[in-house]
A protein has these predicted regions:
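Iron-sulfur cluster-binding electron-transfer modules in prokaryotic oxidoreductases
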Residues: 1-196
Length: 196
C-alpha cells in the first residue's frame, strides 16, 4: 500500500542532507533506475513547491548517464579491455521513464568490440509486486516476454539498470536452465572490462 505522506516526509529529510553535498559542488549519482526516477521526477511531482526537491532533481544523474557524460566531456581512464560473449541489456521501465535514452547501452558501447542486444520489455518485478505471494505469479507472467528474448539472444551476460528487475529476469531464466552468468548492473560490466 502506498504511503504518500511518509514518502513526502522522507523526501524532505533526505533532500536536505543531499543538498549539503550539492552546495559543495557535487552531483547526486543514483545506482538504480528506480532511485533516479524517484529523485528526478517522483519527488518533484509529490512536492512541486519544495525548492530543495527542485534543486536536487536538477543535480541528480543515473550512474550510466553520469559515465556516458564523463566519457563525452573528459574521456575514460585508459585500460578498458574487451569482454567476450556479448551482453543482453534489459532497459528497465524506471530507466525508460526518465526520458534520458538508453544510457546503459550507451555506456556499454564504451567497451571495445562488445556485442550488445537490448530488451525493452517490462521485467514484471515492479518493486515489491514481484516478491509478494499474491502477485508473484503475475510478475512472472509479465516478465516471461523479456526473459524469452534474453534466452534467445544467448549472450554470456545479462545486465539491467534495475538490479531487482535483473534478478527477477535471472530467476525466470533459471527456470529454463539457461547458463549465462548472473544478472549484473551495467556498471559491473564496465568494472569487469577494467579488470576491477
Amino acid at each position: 500500500q502506498a504511503e504518500p505522506q511518509k514518502v513526502c516526509d522522507q523526501a524532505i529529510k533526505v533532500s536536505k542532507e543531499l543538498l549539503k553535498w550539492v552546495e559543495k559542488g557535487y552531483e547526486v549519482i543514483t545506482l538504480t533506475a528506480s532511485c533516479g526516477l524517484m529523485l528526478k521526477f517522483e519527488w518533484p511531482l509529490l512536492l512541486p513547491d519544495n525548492e530543495d526537491i527542485k534543486q536536487l532533481s536538477k543535480k541528480t544523474k543515473d550512474i550510466d548517464e553520469y559515465i556516458v557524460d564523463i566519457s563525452k566531456k573528459e574521456g575514460l581512464a585508459k585500460g578498458i579491455g574487451e569482454i567476450d560473449g556479448g551482453v543482453t541489456v534489459h532497459h528497465a521501465c524506471h530507466a525508460r521513464a526518465q526520458n534520458m535514452g538508453n544510457k546503459a547501452r550507451d555506456m556499454l558501447k564504451l567497451i571495445p568490440n562488445i556485442k550488445i542486444d537490448v530488451v525493452e520489455k517490462c521485467a514484471g518485478h515492479g518493486g515489491t509486486f514481484g516478491v509478494m505471494k499474491g502477485s508473484h505469479d503475475v510478475a512472472n507472467k509479465v516478465g516471461k516476454g523479456a526473459s524469452k528474448i534474453i534466452i534467445k539472444k544467448n549472450n554470456k551476460y545479462m545486465a539491467s539498470d534495475c538490479p531487482l528487475a535483473g534478478k527477477h529476469l535471472k530467476q525466470l531464466e533459471q527456470d529454463t536452465n539457461i547458463s549465462n552468468d548472473e544478472a549484473l548492473h551495467p556498471i559491473e560490466l564496465i568494472a569487469k572490462a577494467y579488470k576491477i
